[in-house]
Amino acid sequence: MKSYISPIEDIISEASQGKMFILVDAEERENEGDLVIPAEDANDNVINFMAKNGRGLICLALNDDKVDSLGLTLMSSNNQSRHETAFTVSIEAREGVTTGISAQDRALTIATAISDNSKSTDIVSPGHVFPIKARPGGVLVRAGHTEAAVDIAKLAGKNPSGVICEIMNDDGTMARLPELIAVSYTHLR
């Protein structure tokens, strides 16, 4: 199975071209795969693809500086989740969205949140986009999809943020490596 895993240089190259990729974590951790793309490349077609083919929760991975500048608070002040995933309150763009759930609305919310000029008044809570705060130090501190998405975007010369979505099988179970390989060959090549 190792031959199906791309070297990090290839992943960074894909990210620099605005391409989506699958990030797989260790078997002893979550043993799951996420669709990942630098957030600046997450248009409505990407969001729709993630919703349709990933089927998991679509999240916005942000560094701590952006979380702070947007005034986002953590969803829980006493995080007791297994991997201490740092979800913030959900968000929506203040302007330009309808109900907030469409692929277009979520893409607009993401673009608004990651803009270099964005401020806390540009977004509202609750919403249909779920930010996650990456730990400072990235994957060297926490080996999670959140930190990897931010690190890879940064290494690719992109805005240091990513959009991630867990990949589930048709029956609602989590996709594991054999299924993730099939998803990659079917949709991302």
Feature map (PLM): residue ranges:
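N-terminal glycine-/serine-/threonine-rich phosphate-binding loop
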Residues: 1-36
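Feature captures the catalytic cores and cofactor-binding loops of soluble hydro-lyases/lyases
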Residues: 31, 41-58, 68-69, 159-162, ...
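Hydrophobic alpha-helical hairpins/lids featuring a short glycine-rich hinge
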Residues: 78-137
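Glycine-rich phosphate/pyrophosphate-binding loops
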Residues: 130, 140-141, 145-175
